[in-house]
A protein has these predicted regions:
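Long, well-ordered early-domain segments
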Residues: 85-129
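A contiguous, well-ordered beta/alpha segment that forms the leading edge of an enzyme domain
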Residues: 76-88
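Residues forming the flavin
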Residues: 1-79, 118-122, 127-451, 455-575
Length: 575
């Protein structure tokens, strides 16, 4: 922290400085600019987009204006009922109300004034659709595809999407397209062929880059926002890490960054917005706050998120909350990639089971991914056998479905698995007993578990954990598998195993904020001039994950809210 009571700080001056370049950060920057404020965005990395760029890009917006037109229904009362039930003891009525009230306004604002368009996803259910106020779809919205050519030179500094979201690591899909293909719905093969043909025949773009011109998911979202920044002349400085916040004794009035290898002071006359991610890549903070064991290399988040904003806030006396929680997801290692890949959909397919070192199940494999991680650690506390866990599947699963690092065997047979991956990344054996020996899992326990799973496949009812028992479970199931799309016999040799680590797409804990995104001290007082959102702030959703897009939706909404509050405070100051 720097304190300058002589008001001489700053090598440059803006009304607002935004730290970070994900969707929440850029939404705050756009809204502040459009309210008449001068804005600078600073990003520590040499590429922009943050965690948003590698994400699915969805936003969870109850009561959005597309629901009725698509044949659905929603209401504020239902959304409040659902969140009160799901969020539970962490329910903050004022913050939740601000989120529900401003989320649809934020979407409408971006649609009208920026390049950013969203499409509601009709059949993507809330993560707990059977809870009070839960919905079978519509609340999640995904960004419309965006033509990368519209970015010009800024395409070169857009953080690349996760290869896991692309066909063959190259070809982009929307969320709706991905579901059609993964669930093998009617027309899926024709759709996949059309996407591949479009990519292959884009000769002009292929000469520039192997990346797809048609951006989707998180890449489409940050690209559209970056184009809107450019249109307004809002500067985004890359390779500019924040080193500290600056105060004039009473309020935050700027930041000290590193620019061209030296300290550079930036005065922010009206506010600083911290939107620079969580602490996934900071092993010391993980060791201090998260359940054990925990390793930064297990994360699916970009390795730039080291808790800079959280630590800067703590230095000013800010309060923190939820520091022991993450937006958890099971992850798998991929040689040559900087981060692990999340297992988002593979667990829902039939003919697979997740077990610990004892060969026992500990969770409904199809459950929302944060619940899998909660269960993984809860059971590990008793057994010390869950880290790592293992996804076990048979030859029929291998043939039909993608899994972590591999395309379906019908497309990528074992003969095309990269050299050195067998019995290192993916394990294979002629029998379950042999497979258990290779991976250090109790053979008898595994055999008993598979026998029970095969019985559940016949009846369609998982009496232990209820796999396939609700609408969300079945979303990525295989509709051709009867009577339960998430259950099938594990019986065809060879058998396979994939190591599963307790990773995350981001940490949940961060600076405690109010309904205006202002950072608070432990006594509830406001740190004037300082705002936080996204994973730099403690999650408005508490320890839970109500639906797809519950990370980015609040980040963007509170970016919008923060900008409005800064603008209103500016107006009050000059009255």
């Amino acid at each position: 922290m720097h304190d300058d009571r002589h008001d001489s700080f700053g090598d440059a001056t803006y009304d607002v400085v935004v730290v970070g370049s994900g969707a929440g950060a850029m939404t705050a920057a756009l809204r502040a600019h459009d309210q008449g404020l001068s804005v600078l965005v600073v990003e520590k990395s040499t590429v922009y987009g943050g965690t948003t760029a590698v994400s699915g890009g969805g936003i969870w917006i109850p009561c959005n204006d597309q629901i009725a037109a698509l044949g659905g229904s929603d209401s504020y009362d239902e959304a409040i009922m659902y969140l009160r039930d799901v969020v539970g003891e962490d329910f903050d009525a004022r913050r939740i109300d601000a989120y529900l009230d401003n989320g649809p306004k934020m979407v409408a604002y971006l649609a009208k004034h920026a390049h950013t368009r969203f499409n509601a996803v009709p059949r993507y259910p809330d993560y707990y659709p059977d809870r009070k106020g839960g919905k079978p779809g519509y609340r999640t919205m995904e960004p419309a595809p965006f033509d990368a050519a519209r970015l010009g030179a800024h395409f070169d500094t857009l953080r690349a999407p996760s290869p896991a979201t692309l066909i063959g690591g190259r070809i982009a899909m929307t969320q709706i397209e991905a579901h059609t293909i993964l669930a093998k719905e009617r027309g899926w093969l024709r759709l996949a062929a059309r996407l591949m043909l479009r990519y292959a025949t884009d000769f002009k773009w292929r000469r520039r880059t192997p990346r797809d011109r048609r951006l989707t998911l998180g890449n489409a979202l940050v690209a559209s926002l970056r184009a809107a920044l450019e249109q307004r002349g809002i500067a985004l400085w890359l390779a500019t890490p924040m080193r500290s916040l600056h105060t004039d004794g009473a309020r935050v009035n700027g930041v000290v960054v590193e620019r061209d290898g030296r300290p550079f002071g930036i005065r922010a006359t009206h506010g600083v917005v911290l939107a620079c991610g969580g602490f996934e890549a900071n092993q010391a903070m993980r060791d201090q706050y998260l359940p054990k064991p925990t390793r930064a290399e297990w994360s699916a988040a970009p390795p730039i998120n080291t808790g800079d904003g959280i630590r800067a806030g703590l230095a000013l006396g800010a309060d923190v909350a939820l520091m022991g929680f993450v937006w958890g997801v099971p992850t798998v290692r991929v040689p040559g990639e900087e981060k692990q890949r999340g297992l988002f959909v593979e667990r829902s397919a039939p003919r697979c089971v997740m077990v610990n070192r004892l060969g026992r199940r500990f969770v409904n494999e199809s459950a929302p991914y944060p619940d899998v991680i909660h269960a993984m650690y809860a059971d590990h506390a008793n057994t010390q056998a869950n880290v790592p866990a293992w996804l076990i599947f048979d030859a029929e699963y291998r043939k039909r479905y993608p899994c972590g690092v591999l395309l379906p065997g019908s497309v990528q047979p074992d003969s095309r698995i990269p050299p050195g991956w067998l019995d290192s990344v993916i394990y294979r054996a002629g029998s379950l007993a042999e497979l258990a020996a290779k991976i250090g899992v109790d053979a008898q326990g595994l055999a008993q578990t598979v026998e029970r799973m095969n019985g559940y496949a016949l009846t369609g009812i998982d009496t232990e954990f209820g796999k396939g028992g609700n609408l969300f479970d079945r979303y990525y199931g295989d509709s051709s598998s009867k009577p339960n799309p998430c259950l099938g016999p594990i019986e065809r040799a060879p058998f396979y195993a994939l190591r599963v680590d307790p990773g995350e797409i981001g940490t949940k804990g961060g600076l405690r904020t109010d309904a205006h995104a202002r950072v608070l001290r432990s006594d509830g007082s406001v740190i004037d001039g300082l705002y936080a959102l996204g994973n730099t702030s403690a999650a408005v959703m508490g320890k839970t994950y109500p639906g797809p897009g519950s990370t980015i939706g609040p980040a963007m909404t509170f970016g919008y809210v923060a900008a409005d509050h800064i603008a209103a405070a500016r107006s009050d100051r000059f009255l």
